Amino acid sequence: MFQDNPLLAQLKQQLHSQTPRAEGVVKATEKGFGFLEVDAQKSYFIPPPQMKKVMHGDRIVAVIHTEKERESAEPEELIEPFLTRFVGKVQGKNDRLSIVPDHPLLKDAIPCRAARGVQHEFKEGDWAVAEMRRHPLKGDRSFYADLTQYITFADDHFVPWWVTLARHNLEKEAPNGVATEMLDEGLERQDLTALNFVTIDSASTEDMDDALYAEELADGRLQLTVAIADPTAWIAEGSKLDNAAKIRAFTNYLPGFNIPMLPRELSDDLCSLRANEVRPALACRMIIAADGTIDDDIAFFAATIESKAKLVYDNVSDWLENNGTWQPENEGIAQQIRLLHRICLSRSEWRHHHALVFKDRPDYRFVLGEKGEVLDIVAEPRRIANRIVEESMIAANLCAARVLRDKLGFGIYNVHTGFDPANADALAALLKTHGLHVDAEEVLTLEGFCKLRRELDAQPSGFLDSRIRRFQSFAEISTEPGPHFGLGLEAYATWTSPIRKYGDMINHRLLKAVIKGEAIARPQEDITQQMAERRRLNRMAERDVGDWLYARFLNDKAGTNTRFAAEIIDVSRGGMRVRLVDNGAIAFIPAPFLHAVRDELVCSQENGTVQIKGETVYKVTDVIDVTIAEVRMETRSIIARPAA
């Protein structure tokens, strides 16, 4: 008699609409219970039995119950699952398999089976890619996944690389394909093979894409010719090789090895500007005044060059600093180094006054054994030879940005607009509390941004600089010319690494159209999105492999008294993150290691400080001594404590 009763249906509807609900993200804990985080201020308790229906990171709608003034959440509807495609370790044997996701907060094994078409017989410890198929909030009894790809076996020494590449769905090897002959591009190439071009790189570099040649003019000004490898002389737009490069967008540099954007035959040989080999190149000639100003008369042209020497950063730096035994092989090469050094000094001086110069940070290089074991981690400071190349490349990219803007009105530009306008007032208020007075409008201009950066660089520590970083916008890739506030330049378009950046290949094609005086279509917007996404994934992959190798390297230091100098890079409610100065490893210091009495401790992310009993004891950019308390290999996390 109650069936199809409209009154009953109405009552049900009423009860449903009156029950309080909340949407948020599930945060798991190691103790079985969890929280529904609605926003930064509000969260609801999820009891252990209800946590069985959800997973850490799921976005859900939950019913809010109140019992004895205590609120709790009952998951009701799945908005967006946290896990879709993931990597993990297989447990069990073929008949009863499960997989534990490789994630610090996901500990539960998920029942699974090999997807149709996957031939591998999975066994305990195998690494695999899986895709979620069932979820309790979708009406299923439990979680369930399909194993869609075998990655590698448990004891493979190269697990960090293969698992990371699979996690981010990135290629494991160089693209296939060969280029048999150069294209007829209708370009007249200037023969510069007699000139003393040199390359300066790391000793191990094979994909040399820039060569430099300098000469002094009669009036004392210096003329710099930057010759860049020319892969678009071999690769036609829209060809199979071009499409593969477009998808990869960049060469992926990981500790120990790289996965090139182009076939190795091209990247390391045919296009690489090897010493004493004749190569096609795209070149830019510019004249630099004594004060570092680049003359408006910039020439781009196609050329043929022959590098006369493969120079190595450390050798060139030692020679310029009068150290070591290395000598240039002849006076012609020595003269090149001297002239390039002069160009570097004048351009650096110009950028200090008219643009911005980054503070030098060392590069950290992993020294690996045959089996991927970390033998050492070496901090490689940026020396004078690195700066010679850097200044030449920045000058060349500035020239390309101007030429593309003035001749075409588009290109592949690196754009950075400084501070987000929405943050300008908060930024000015924060700076005021530290005694720096800026105009909220002016700081949004290139000139105002540069002025502020110079004031910050003059501060005794980088503390204030670290505080305002959160107000900055991110650098973007755009087809529209625009300023690069981070470099302090009116426009910046890279074309100097076409072997390893697809955007630079596009700019080569655009510059060639300018050289020939031909019209050319504007690049599609979707290519900039692909490049930005690939850059993000490659950076995450580099960080993930690095975390794994750092954990391996520091594992035997856990629980010892070995001290490391560490810079505080971030403070959060739970403690602080530090970077070990000698090797670049990131470690976490939990709040209880800072002070035993929680009520007397205030860790403020907002202020970047740690206060104990009202006194600021630590702040971001401080360098302190730490010891390694623990290394958690399963999550690749390093726990440190302040040294006693």
UniProtKB/Swiss-Prot annotation:
Top-level enzyme category: hydrolase
PROSITE patterns referenced in this protein's UniProt entry, alphabetically: RIBONUCLEASE_II
Family annotation (Pfam families): OB_RNB, RNB, S1
Biological processes per GO annotation: mRNA catabolic process
Domain RNB: 189-516
Catalytic activity of the protein: Exonucleolytic cleavage in the 3'- to 5'-direction to yield nucleoside 5'-phosphates
Key words of the record: Cytoplasm, Exonuclease, Hydrolase, Nuclease, RNA-binding
Domain called S1 motif: residue spans: 561-643
InterPro entries: CSD, NA-bd_OB-fold, RNase_B_OB_dom, RNase_II, RNase_II/R, RNase_II/R_CS, RNase_II/RNase_R, RNR_Ribonuclease
Single GO MF descriptor: RNA binding
One Gene Ontology cellular component annotation held by this UniProt entry: cytosol
Coiled-coil blocks: none
Locations listed in the record: Cytoplasm
UniProt EC number: 3.1.13.1
Role according to the record: Involved in mRNA degradation. Hydrolyzes single-stranded polyribonucleotides processively in the 3' to 5' direction.
HAMAP family: RNase_II (MF_01036)
PANTHER family associated with the record: EXORIBONUCLEASE 2 (PTHR23355:SF37), RIBONUCLEASE (PTHR23355)
UniProt xrefs under NCBIfam families: 3_prime_RNase (TIGR00358), PRK05054.1 (NF003455), RNase_B (TIGR02062)
Family of this protein: Belongs to the RNR ribonuclease family. RNase II subfamily.
The protein's name: Exoribonuclease 2
Organism: Salmonella paratyphi A (strain AKU_12601)
Gene coding for it: rnb
